[in-house]
């Protein structure tokens, strides 16, 4: 064999079999940076139609986690695929740099502002901290292979950005959407600040659940309104149920549902006979809860018949009215709701209708104010026990028990929050029809998955006014002057805000905090108070449509796509929508796509304590970023995304299949120059045209899947193409032709041409996902080409077959189905030990008429398709009894271990081996290929 080895066209390439991604990717990244790949991509795309994916800013705090990696990789896949589709697809990354988490980390190092450090120095420390965090995160994002304008990202703490946020707030004020009010807001005692909806998370909490008597002051009037024929005996009370006893000091009313039925029940519930007003739909279970005895219904009435009746507060010397509210329901409690407008949104809304006092006896530290009777200075949650004790002493506690329920917590501190009425600045949801307009814009937007629309609609329909003010040091200021007497904004507010914005452009937010009012207001300064609040960070990020999309030349409004995690329906998607609609009346995006959260293999949330955290840095350092990218693409991101070391290892196995396919194509293109050696499609062998047709059809599916953001389908299709269409069929069949025919023969050049076209297409299919690997493949492809695969577009030189042409798809579908059926029979014979490989076999095929004609068309080349030494075709009626029925209807086969000698060059067993005097070890075909004019192939 040694003397014939040099006559074979064996595959050869410098493209490494071992990926060593963890070592090679950083080198590729340096190359991209040195060549300014993103800049070249921008230049190459100039003049194309634009596609704008707007980056929602991650928070500049801490190392990136697997969720960050998912988000950035998905965005990068989309941007790169859009570029390949012929779009100008810029990507400008950004960071959210203000807010509480940064403050808390800086506090740990330098202390609280105003105590251990002055506020200006504290803000400088926050800015320095955020900048370091941005740099660390940027390094990791780039390492993931994400292409973007990393040299010029947007930062919400940039002076220009801060100034533009102020200008945007000015526009919202001019449109009439801002108002100041005393409203109950989510308040974190540990933060010392109001919280946005998106900063609240719900956790299980155990609370005291108590039933409280509110004695009826006007008993006779209540009996009259209920048309009670028998007055009954004992004290009369309306009973409420609450899990927040600490809100009772602020009680201003008891709410009933106007349309619900209520019953007045006489019973014994531990204090002798008494009369209790309860909802008819709940009274049985309520009385059972009290272990009440001898219950008698005295009267029935509707809630709206009792409006305005006076009740006695359970421990203060004041009366409170019965009011009506649609928020009252029969899900739990008694059907009567304790109402404290200073401590709850529903209470606030109904209280406003009745002009109730918005009483807030709780300070920002979570303790009752000094003037609060009975409970002054007590922390509210600890005061629960004291309040319950007072209720017992007053005889107004009916029942006490513990209840585990879902309760709002601060997302940062993980501690229970309170509802607390404070003076705050709000974007009013009703003024100028903001809520209605926002809902209309939601309907005009495409949401993927579709349930996202219903989710955000429900949130916008039911959300309260947006509290945009915070009592923090590190944030964009709300630069307003309020009249000391009237509370009204300065009449020249728009001009003043623009002046402040100009100063902030030069000095940052410190320009406002250092500003003396007289610098802008002159003699009017003593009459006005300078607002010290800062903006909710969700306002900062929510106005990137004006501060980034509108201000950067390569971008524009609306963006084509916003893409974030599904938690952003109540976060960035919503804040962006509301601010954009408030300013320009339209949504800032055409489409919104959301991805699920990452969980471990068992669907559990990741946590260090569970030991199931997958850190992207570790994956990049071991398996490589491309494995992480392939996992993201392979997973249906619309639901939860399972990841673990084992899952990533399986992905790495799939990666090797695709890499090996690319390597095999490259190895067989050694010495091939497409401009010199390329064979026109019409002159190519039939099987090669079939392979190109498969690639052409697949490319259509892949481009469509990229268009539809179905990346997991791309992974499935490409992997299947590499494993089946290429590995199991085409490359397996042409191996003989590629290795044994003459180097410059049409048969070999035809196969090389097909492999060249397939490689050109494959490298582009892979590029958005396996970015490092695709660019590595690109460097080894023959022919002239640009510096990077990312500077090109989808490959367009893939010819396709017709369905019914003589050698069209229908023909090859039949042939390859027969091949698969025969291969299974051959495998059975091999397992039995009768043959070593399929080339040790001869097959006699007995077939029905339609299949007979198709197989006969291939003539002697059928054996190359089946990879057997002989393949003979006979009509089905001639089949012997030993013929085996295959899985293909109308096809039987007899497998015969060949007794002919084996050609040492092509390994086929042929009758004529040994008949050539000079080459006794070769078959006639190999003699022709080594000494003659070369064999001729037509089909395979």
UniProtKB/Swiss-Prot annotation:
Annotated motif 'HIGH' region, positions: 58-68
Catalytic activity: tRNA(Ile) + L-isoleucine + ATP = L-isoleucyl-tRNA(Ile) + AMP + diphosphate
GO cellular component, one term: cytosol
Cofactor, free-text remark: Binds 1 zinc ion per subunit.
Group of enzyme by EC: ligase
Keywords attached to this entry: Aminoacyl-tRNA synthetase, ATP-binding, Cytoplasm, Ligase, Metal-binding, Nucleotide-binding, Protein biosynthesis, Zinc
Family matches, as PROSITE patterns: AA_TRNA_LIGASE_I
Domain comment (free text): IleRS has two distinct active sites: one for aminoacylation and one for editing. The misactivated valine is translocated from the active site to the editing site, which sterically excludes the correctly activated isoleucine. The single editing site contains two valyl binding pockets, one specific for each substrate (Val-AMP or Val-tRNA(Ile)).
UniProt family annotation: Belongs to the class-I aminoacyl-tRNA synthetase family. IleS type 1 subfamily.
Record's function text: Catalyzes the attachment of isoleucine to tRNA(Ile). As IleRS can inadvertently accommodate and process structurally similar amino acids such as valine, to avoid such errors it has two additional distinct tRNA(Ile)-dependent editing activities. One activity is designated as 'pretransfer' editing and involves the hydrolysis of activated Val-AMP. The other activity is designated 'posttransfer' editing and involves deacylation of mischarged Val-tRNA(Ile).
Name used for this protein in its record: Isoleucine--tRNA ligase
Species of provenance: Nitrosococcus oceani (strain ATCC 19707 / BCRC 17464 / JCM 30415 / NCIMB 11848 / C-107)
